[in-house]
A protein has these predicted regions:
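Residues forming the flavin
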Residues: 1-229
Length: 229
């Protein structure tokens, strides 16, 4: 056909009780800036419809639980603890980029072997890259699991673990750090009538397709609710 299909690309493993997996492979795409506020550096990936660029990019995710990020019992009780962790990481990434939108980056094999990359390949990320020791400043529970995960993927797929691949920091918004509670049957907020928490921002999806499916379900339930008013 005229357009390439979505890439069949999936890597999944477990490292120290947490999932490490690929997310949203974009063949023939771009890495783009995705910050939504000051003092943040966030990246995301996309493909145009013809998937016609020279690059492919995928998120690499480490499953994260509240006990991984909190520093006290009191903090563990904070319902926004994961959001505060996300904010800290995004600000740290911005600081590592000299407080600009040039993204910290490292060649994959260098990252796995705790080496600084003295040069970087060309990239689709328009603001540019800055060589950075991601293995050193990223949260250790993330970097260590990524390193072990990449080693496993390299054993399972020849050519995966290579210095031709570039890690660009950081995609921190694969899923919401907060879930707004809703009823399992009506999909309505448990306290506020007529409010239907929906999609990625509310914590019920992680990607375009799942967000679309959840949106359709919520629209149907919203229509049923309005009929009864």
């Amino acid at each position: 056909g005229k357009y390439l299909p979505a890439a069949e690309y999936s890597f999944v493993t477990q490292v120290d009780g947490r999932g490490v997996y690929s997310f949203c492979m974009c063949p023939g795409g771009f890495v783009i800036p995705a910050a939504t506020g000051p003092e943040q550096l966030v990246v995301n990936g996309m493909s145009p419809s013809n998937r016609g660029t020279a690059w492919s990019n995928s998120g690499m995710v480490v499953e994260t639980h509240p006990e991984d990020v909190v520093q006290s019992e009191e903090e563990l009780k904070d319902p926004l603890a994961m959001m505060h962790f996300q904010e800290r990481v995004e600000k740290q990434c911005w600081q590592q980029a000299n407080m600009k939108q040039t993204a910290p980056a490292q060649r994959m094999a260098d990252f796995v072997n705790n080496r600084l990359s003295y040069d970087l390949p060309k990239s689709s990320y328009a603001p540019g890259l800055i060589s950075s020791p991601l293995h050193f400043w990223m949260p250790s529970f993330v970097s260590k699991r990524l390193q072990e995960g990449f080693k496993t993927f390299g054993k399972n797929a020849h050519g995966f673990l290579t210095n031709e691949a570039t890690l660009i920091a950081m995609e921190t918004r694969t899923s919401s750090p907060v879930r707004i509670v809703r009823d399992r049957e009506t999909l309505m907020h448990v306290r506020i009538q007529g409010l239907f928490p929906c999609g990625e921002g509310a914590g019920y999806a992680g990607g375009i397709v799942s967000a679309g499916v959840d949106g359709e379900r919520c629209a149907e339930m919203c229509a049923e609710y309005l009929k009864q008013q």
